[in-house]
Amino acid sequence: MTGGKPQFRIKRIYDAAGDEDGFRVLVDRLWPRSISKETARIDLWMKAVAPSDALRRQFHGNPDGWEAFLAAYAEELEREPARSAAAELRARLRSGAVTLLYAARDEAHNNAEALRRLLAAASS
């Protein structure tokens, strides 16, 4: 991240918190299983920016539908309260590192990765 525009980081909530994480935001709609709030060390749980329950269930049942999930999630982020929550995340990034936390096992296809991509696209 040196010299360029700050970027959102993503990390599984089950991974140890580090100083480099900066502001830690859980972006899942549901609290992750088998982890306490103390262990998670989150600064904010932002349910409003998470995919809707319907979209989450649809994607969970069809991991091959990544591109369709991205498109549907982008539409959701254009509506309130998700739009305001996304704007708050972008504002926090201007103040320092922001790590988007998620619980999914798939490190490449999850809502935090989708959110990171969509926020980056909206900022460029």
Each language-model region and where it sits:
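Residues lining hydrophobic/aromatic ligand-binding pockets adjacent to catalytic sites
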Residues: 2-124
